[in-house]
Amino acid sequence: MSFIKSLLLAAAAVASVSARRGPEPKYPPAAGTSSYCSYWVDYEGDKSCSRVLEDNVVVLKDFARWNPTVGADCSGIKAGNSYCVEAFGEPEPIEVTTTTRAATTTTQPTATTTTFANGIATPQPTQSGMVTNCNKFHWIAEGVSCSQVISFQKITLADFVKWNPSVKSDCSGMWAGVNVCVGVVGSSTDTAKPTTTAPSNGVVTPQPTQPSMVTNCNKFHWIAKGVTCQQVISYQKISLADFVKWNPSVLSDCSGMWAEVQVCVGVIGSTPTTLATTTTTAGNGVSTPLPTQPGMVTNCAKFHWVAKGVTCNQIYSFQKITLEQFVSYNPTVKSDCSGMQAEVQVCVGLIAGTTPTTTRPPTTTAPGNGVSTPQPTQPGMVTNCAKFHWVAKGVTCNQIYSFQKITLEQFVSFNPTVKSDCTGMQAEVNVCVGLIGGNPTPTQTGNGIATPTPIQPGMVSNCKKFHWIAQGVTCQQVISFQKITLADFVKWNTGVGSDCRTMWAETNVCVGV
């Protein structure tokens, strides 16, 4: 799993869909946590241990191994601690054998022996053109890169390509869903030798590295997919100037930083420049974290970091302020939010609690119903609405009704012009997400099971167990986590296709009938 694991929407955080996740822990890690941990969940006690595992697509065995304070029955998880949910590069505790992929009705056939009587059982399927004297194998899950394989197996790229020629020197030919060779019979070159940054400097440099990295580096940071310069320098408490000096090819705007390489975050004999905070105006007593949104007011007392992909609506909804207040604190954001920059601090509260009044006056949906309706609204919205949601640009139907814990059917019944496929939903309007007197209960299917929506096209009608497909999740992760076969998964969700290439993200799939 990459740093991805994709960042949650701030709006989802408000609803406590799951705890905050990220490449650095917010809370103290539990004692004995794996030193290989590359992704964390900050546990606040609002979910069960099993829900934490499901939300992060982690099995209990791995979770307990990475977090020794967690018991084999998922006991021992405590609020106020950060727990590891990914440990990239950690050696497997049990040697992989050919019995791990038993013969089933899935597309993965029973392991067979290789030819030429070398006596080594070769798990199937394999990378095309793989050598016949292989004695060690690695399963390529979807999304895994050459760099991850050779780093984890401690082999060189040259050996990897030699043993798997069809992979090609640039790794463009590596397949997903196959076994590749990572060791051969009688080979003494199956372990990559670590290199030093410069002769006799005494520092071992992990590979691969960012091109043109300085030779006197003594501290390194692995760049997972999706990680930004700002996250690295903030976590390492170094300045952007030092980071670029030690990694020149990154460039001053960080556009040259590679993913899945080591970068330098400290050098021999150097005390790195630390990132200092400044005050917004001399004498106001408030420290302002940098960098900030251009034109931000000088009397700001509360700040919010704008991660890539975050919208205005997510910020002011999470901070419980209005769009008008947000724009008045950060004028260059503009009323349509087109001017908001990413990876800067924005102001979300003023000194002494000054709060500009909203410029969007409420009106009532109909005379006498007693509910004030914020304007503008989705055309055709029902007149007995009691709860509203502002639709920012780029927000989808699914994000709204999932956040509000209602069904698609309810959402469309409250806002008919949205249409069942959501093509009619307008941006920058208020939609209805709750009625006066409460919402009607969702309609159950004939089997008595309420089916969450939206669903994967082609899902069977007798499904009893469902799994939400977050962005970036693969079929392999789902079937491994749910302990089902690929054949059953495809049978219950015919729309995913036999090779799972048409599985939709942000839908529910069937994992039990």
From Swiss-Prot:
Annotated region (Disordered), positions in chain: 357-377
Signal peptide, first to last residue: 1-19
All copies of domain LysM, residue ranges: 38-85, 136-182, 219-265, 302-348, 387-433, 465-511
PROSITE patterns per record: LYSM (PS51782)
GO MF term set: chitin binding
Organism this protein belongs to: Verticillium dahliae (strain VdLs.17 / ATCC MYA-4575 / FGSC 10137) (Verticillium wilt)
Record-stated family: Belongs to the secreted LysM effector family.
Domain statement: The LysM (lysin motif) domains are small globular domains involved in binding chitin in eukaryotes. Vd6LysM contains 6 LysM domains.
Keyword hit for Ribosomal protein: no
Function: Might have a role in sequestration of chitin oligosaccharides (breakdown products of fungal cell walls that are released during invasion and act as triggers of host immunity) to dampen host defense. Does not play an important role during host colonization.
Biased composition (Low complexity): 357-367
Keyword Cytoplasm: no
Origin: domain of life: Eukaryota
Extra remark beyond the main annotation: In plants, chitin acts as a microbe-associated molecular pattern (MAMP) that is recognized by lysin motif (LysM)-containing plant cell surface-localized pattern recognition receptors (PRRs) that activate a plethora of downstream immune responses.
Keyword terms, alphabetized: Chitin-binding, Repeat, Signal, Virulence
Lineage: Eukaryota, Fungi, Dikarya, Ascomycota, Pezizomycotina
InterPro entries per UniProt: LysM1-like, LysM_dom, LysM_dom_sf
Knockout-associated phenotype: Does not affect virulence on Arabidopsis, N.benthamiana and tomato.
Name of the featured protein: Secreted LysM effector Vd6LysM
